[in-house]
Design a protein with these regions (language model features):
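Intrinsically disordered, low-complexity regulatory regions
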Residues: 1-85
Length: 85
């Protein structure tokens, strides 16, 4: 699998995750605008640092890959909000 195919797979996984979370949360990310998304990105970066530094996750159902997919989606959400303004 080449890099383009790998990126397509990541986009596909991220889109499916976005759809599931969007069903649960709706358009909640837009409520607080880009600053709200920045806070969530900061939370995920902290989680990324914690996982990579400690090599363990205390939240068993959230792996490093999940955190990175969330970061991918939060970046996309920020882009959506920027395009709306």
């Amino acid at each position: 699998m080449d890099r383009v195919q790998q990126l397509e797979e990541i986009h596909s996984q991220s889109l499916e995750l976005f759809k599931k979370k969007n069903q649960d949360y709706g358009d909640a990310f837009a409520k607080y605008g880009t600053l709200g998304v920045l806070v969530r990105i900061s939370d995920k970066l902290q989680r990324f640092q914690s996982i990579t530094k400690n090599q363990i996750t205390l939240v068993e159902d959230e792996k490093l890959e999940d955190t990175l997919l969330d970061l991918h989606n939060y970046s996309a959400m920020a882009l959506m909000l920027l395009k709306e303004n």
